[in-house]
Each structure stands twice: as C-alpha cells, then as structure tokens.
C-alpha cells in the first residue's frame, strides 16, 4: 500500500515559530521524527510551493514532492446558498472586521487587540471573531480588561457550512499570523 503525506504545516518550524521551542532535545527529536516520516512515505504533497525548501533541507526528497494547493468548497462559490438572515441578529451594526479561524498563538491576537484598541473610539468599527482555540480565554479576558466589549465580539465556533452566512456580514475579512518567516510560506 502506497502512502502519501499532505503537509499543511512545516514541523518543527511551525511549533518553534508559535513560541513553543526553538532548540534543544525536543526540537531535535521532532526534526528526526519528521525526517523519518518523509523517508517512509511514497509521496509528500505540499499545500504551498514554498514548503519545498524546508522539506529538502531535511533530506533528498525532491522526487517525492508534489504541489497540491488547498481549495475552497463549493459552498464558498455559490452565492445562491447564502442565507443573509441566518446570523443577522448576532452581527453588530457598523463596519465589520471579521476574523474567522483558529484563535491560537500563531494568529497574533496581541496585534489584533492592539488594532481594536486603536479603533476603540470609532464606535462604528466592530471586530467580530469567529472560532475557538487555545487563546480564546485570553482574548475574552483581554476584551473585558481593555474595555473593548462594545467593539469586539467573540461569536464562538460554527461549522464550515455556516461560514458563508457569517462572511456575508463582513465588510473586511482579517487574516492574521505572527510576523515569522515560516508563516509567510503558507499564505
């Protein structure tokens, strides 16, 4: 049976960039584990062509690498499927900046919160955060401590099928990652 690995994140680089470790025994062990996986699989599929360099630094895997980009499901391309009324009551009135993703370390919520603070006096600018993750409680706490409750709204997690119904209410969609070279390879 042939086996293929579809690489969505580069390890251990992504773990390091998220602030979990930069070197040491665990980092070296992760590197060896990743090298072992790359050696054992028949093919390595990458979602970003920029991933090749990192993978090739771990060994001679050029013959195994294939580029297979991420795609969007049809529900994101068929406007007739959108129900504008579905989430209307949850979305505040105003200019909506929407973030819909993992609420984690790599997403750089410190910068998002700084931006929300800078726009706090503009009451018509609303920051809507859709998702869940390790930093959700931190973000909720910061929204309260920084007195951002009138402009920052955390809606929680929703299934993929609901995303177009949420996105239709956004004036701007926000994509945020820490300023680390490894993360620039995925966008």
Q: Which stretches of residues belong to each language-model region?
A:
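Alpha-helix capping/helix-boundary segments
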Residues: 50-52, 135
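Conserved donor-binding/catalytic core segment of Leloir-type glycosyltransferases
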Residues: 72, 86-107, 112-117, 128
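Carbohydrate-associated surface elements
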Residues: 50, 68-71, 157
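Nucleotide-sugar-dependent
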Residues: 107, 159-187
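Acidic anion/phosphate-binding donor-loop and adjacent secondary structure
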Residues: 56, 67, 71-87, 108
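Active-site proximal beta-strand in glycosyltransferases
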Residues: 1-15
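Nucleotide-activated donor-binding/catalytic signature segment of Leloir-type glycosyltransferases, i.e.
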Residues: 128-131, 137-164
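Membrane-proximal helix-turn-helix segments that form the acceptor-binding/catalytic region
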Residues: 24-44
């Amino acid at each position: 049976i042939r086996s293929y690995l579809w690489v969505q994140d580069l390890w251990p680089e992504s773990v390091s960039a998220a602030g979990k470790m930069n070197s040491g025994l665990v980092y070296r062990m992760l590197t060896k584990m990743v090298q072992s996986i790359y050696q054992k699989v028949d093919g390595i599929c990458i979602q970003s062509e920029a991933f090749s360099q990192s993978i090739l630094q771990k060994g001679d895997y050029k013959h195994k690498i294939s580029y297979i980009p991420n795609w969007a499901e049809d529900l994101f391309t068929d406007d007739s499927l959108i129900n504008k009324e579905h989430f209307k009551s949850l979305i505040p009135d105003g200019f909506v900046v929407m973030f819909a993703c993992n609420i984690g370390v790599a997403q750089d919520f410190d910068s998002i919160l700084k931006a929300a603070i800078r726009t706090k006096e503009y009451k018509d600018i609303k920051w809507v955060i859709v998702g869940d993750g390790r930093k959700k409680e931190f973000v909720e706490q910061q929204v309260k401590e920084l007195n951002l409750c009138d402009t920052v709204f955390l809606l929680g997690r929703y299934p993929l099928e609901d995303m177009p119904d949420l996105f239709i209410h956004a004036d701007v969609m926000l994509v945020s990652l820490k300023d680390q070279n490894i993360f620039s390879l995925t966008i």
